[in-house]
Protein backbone atom coordinates (compact mmCIF):
# COMPACT_ATOMS: atom_id res chain seq x y z
CA UNK A 1 0.00 0.00 0.00
CA UNK A 2 1.25 3.45 -0.86
CA UNK A 3 1.57 6.16 1.78
CA UNK A 4 4.06 8.92 2.60
CA UNK A 5 7.07 8.04 4.74
CA UNK A 6 6.79 11.30 6.66
CA UNK A 7 4.31 14.20 6.70
CA UNK A 8 4.40 17.69 8.16
CA UNK A 9 1.01 17.21 9.87
CA UNK A 10 -0.76 14.06 11.07
CA UNK A 11 -4.27 15.13 10.08
CA UNK A 12 -5.60 17.20 7.17
CA UNK A 13 -8.72 19.18 6.33
CA UNK A 14 -11.26 17.56 4.04
CA UNK A 15 -11.06 20.26 1.37
CA UNK A 16 -12.73 20.36 -2.04
CA UNK A 17 -11.55 19.40 -5.52
CA UNK A 18 -11.99 22.38 -7.85
CA UNK A 19 -11.10 22.81 -11.51
CA UNK A 20 -9.29 20.55 -13.93
CA UNK A 21 -5.78 19.09 -13.82
CA UNK A 22 -3.14 21.41 -15.23
CA UNK A 23 -0.15 19.22 -14.42
CA UNK A 24 -0.14 15.50 -15.18
CA UNK A 25 -2.79 15.84 -17.88
CA UNK A 26 -0.70 14.40 -20.73
CA UNK A 27 1.15 11.11 -21.23
CA UNK A 28 4.71 11.52 -19.96
CA UNK A 29 6.17 7.99 -19.86
CA UNK A 30 4.12 5.31 -21.61
CA UNK A 31 2.31 4.79 -24.90
CA UNK A 32 -1.15 4.28 -23.35
CA UNK A 33 -2.83 5.75 -20.28
CA UNK A 34 -5.94 5.99 -18.12
CA UNK A 35 -7.27 9.52 -17.67
CA UNK A 36 -9.73 10.62 -14.95
CA UNK A 37 -12.91 12.28 -16.23
CA UNK A 38 -14.39 13.42 -12.90
CA UNK A 39 -13.06 14.68 -9.55
CA UNK A 40 -12.84 12.37 -6.54
CA UNK A 41 -10.58 11.00 -3.83
CA UNK A 42 -8.94 7.70 -4.73
CA UNK A 43 -7.72 5.56 -1.83
CA UNK A 44 -4.39 3.73 -1.66
CA UNK A 45 -6.29 0.42 -1.70
CA UNK A 46 -8.10 1.35 -4.91
CA UNK A 47 -4.83 2.36 -6.57
CA UNK A 48 -3.24 -0.93 -5.49
CA UNK A 49 -6.22 -2.98 -6.74
CA UNK A 50 -6.06 -1.22 -10.11
CA UNK A 51 -2.30 -1.81 -10.31
CA UNK A 52 -2.74 -5.53 -9.60
CA UNK A 53 -5.47 -5.84 -12.24
CA UNK A 54 -3.17 -4.11 -14.76
CA UNK A 55 -0.08 -6.23 -14.11
CA UNK A 56 -2.07 -9.49 -14.02
CA UNK A 57 -3.65 -8.87 -17.40
CA UNK A 58 -0.34 -7.78 -18.93
CA UNK A 59 1.27 -11.01 -17.62
CA UNK A 60 4.31 -9.03 -16.41
CA UNK A 61 5.09 -7.84 -19.95
CA UNK A 62 5.66 -4.15 -20.52
CA UNK A 63 5.98 -1.43 -17.90
CA UNK A 64 3.48 0.37 -15.62
CA UNK A 65 3.71 3.90 -14.21
CA UNK A 66 1.40 5.09 -11.41
CA UNK A 67 1.00 8.85 -11.77
CA UNK A 68 -1.02 9.51 -8.59
CA UNK A 69 0.14 9.21 -4.99
CA UNK A 70 -2.06 9.03 -1.86
CA UNK A 71 -0.62 11.84 0.26
CA UNK A 72 -3.75 13.02 2.10
CA UNK A 73 -4.67 11.34 5.43
CA UNK A 74 -8.36 10.70 6.09
CA UNK A 75 -9.33 10.47 9.75
CA UNK A 76 -12.16 8.36 11.12
CA UNK A 77 -13.77 7.98 14.51
CA UNK A 78 -14.31 4.47 15.90
CA UNK A 79 -17.75 2.84 15.62
CA UNK A 80 -20.39 3.80 18.23
CA UNK A 81 -18.48 6.80 19.55
CA UNK A 82 -20.39 9.98 20.48
CA UNK A 83 -19.86 13.14 18.48
CA UNK A 84 -17.34 15.66 19.73
CA UNK A 85 -14.16 15.08 21.71
CA UNK A 86 -11.83 15.87 18.82
CA UNK A 87 -11.02 14.62 15.39
CA UNK A 88 -10.57 10.89 14.83
CA UNK A 89 -7.24 9.23 14.16
CA UNK A 90 -5.87 8.85 10.61
CA UNK A 91 -7.43 5.76 9.04
CA UNK A 92 -6.43 5.72 5.36
CA UNK A 93 -4.57 7.65 2.68
CA UNK A 94 -6.15 9.16 -0.41
CA UNK A 95 -5.07 11.01 -3.55
CA UNK A 96 -7.12 13.98 -4.76
CA UNK A 97 -7.74 13.42 -8.47
CA UNK A 98 -8.94 16.22 -10.73
CA UNK A 99 -10.62 15.68 -14.12
CA UNK A 100 -8.04 15.31 -16.89
CA UNK A 101 -5.38 13.73 -14.69
CA UNK A 102 -3.52 10.74 -16.18
CA UNK A 103 -3.55 8.15 -13.39
CA UNK A 104 -1.83 5.15 -14.99
CA UNK A 105 0.49 4.75 -17.96
CA UNK A 106 1.67 1.55 -19.64
CA UNK A 107 4.12 0.70 -22.39
CA UNK A 108 5.57 -2.37 -24.10
CA UNK A 109 2.26 -4.07 -24.93
CA UNK A 110 -0.11 -4.04 -27.92
CA UNK A 111 -3.02 -1.61 -28.23
CA UNK A 112 -5.58 -4.38 -27.62
CA UNK A 113 -3.91 -5.71 -24.45
CA UNK A 114 -3.38 -2.15 -23.16
CA UNK A 115 -7.06 -1.29 -23.71
CA UNK A 116 -8.25 -4.49 -21.97
CA UNK A 117 -5.84 -4.07 -19.04
CA UNK A 118 -6.75 -0.41 -18.46
CA UNK A 119 -10.48 -1.26 -18.67
CA UNK A 120 -9.98 -3.85 -15.91
CA UNK A 121 -8.06 -1.29 -13.84
CA UNK A 122 -10.78 1.33 -14.40
CA UNK A 123 -13.36 -1.04 -12.90
CA UNK A 124 -11.46 -0.88 -9.60
CA UNK A 125 -11.63 2.94 -9.43
CA UNK A 126 -14.54 5.07 -8.13
CA UNK A 127 -14.46 7.52 -11.06
CA UNK A 128 -15.21 7.59 -14.78
CA UNK A 129 -12.05 7.24 -16.82
CA UNK A 130 -10.96 7.31 -20.45
CA UNK A 131 -8.36 5.33 -22.38
CA UNK A 132 -5.76 7.65 -23.93
CA UNK A 133 -3.09 6.90 -26.49
CA UNK A 134 0.05 8.72 -27.58
CA UNK A 135 -0.25 10.08 -31.11
CA UNK A 136 2.40 8.63 -33.44
CA UNK A 137 5.01 11.26 -34.24
UniProtKB/Swiss-Prot annotation:
UniProt xrefs under CDD domains: Ribosomal_L16_L10e (cd01433)
Gene3D superfamilies, per database record: Ribosomal protein L10e/L16
Biological-process GO terms, alphabetical: translation
Keyword entries, A-Z: Ribonucleoprotein, Ribosomal protein, RNA-binding, rRNA-binding, tRNA-binding
GO molecular function, one term: structural constituent of ribosome
Superkingdom: Bacteria
Pfam families: Ribosomal_L16
Intrachain disulfide bonds: none
Cellular-component GO terms for this entry: cytosolic large ribosomal subunit
Subunit structure, interactors included: Part of the 50S ribosomal subunit.
Function summary: Binds 23S rRNA and is also seen to make contacts with the A and possibly P site tRNAs.
Family to which this protein belongs: Belongs to the universal ribosomal protein uL16 family.
Protein name, entry field: Large ribosomal subunit protein uL16
Species the sequence originates in: Bradyrhizobium sp. (strain ORS 278)
Amino acid sequence: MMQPKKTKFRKAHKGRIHGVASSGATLAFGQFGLKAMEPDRVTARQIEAARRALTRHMKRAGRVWIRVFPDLPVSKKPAEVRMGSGKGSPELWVARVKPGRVMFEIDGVSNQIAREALTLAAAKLPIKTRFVERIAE
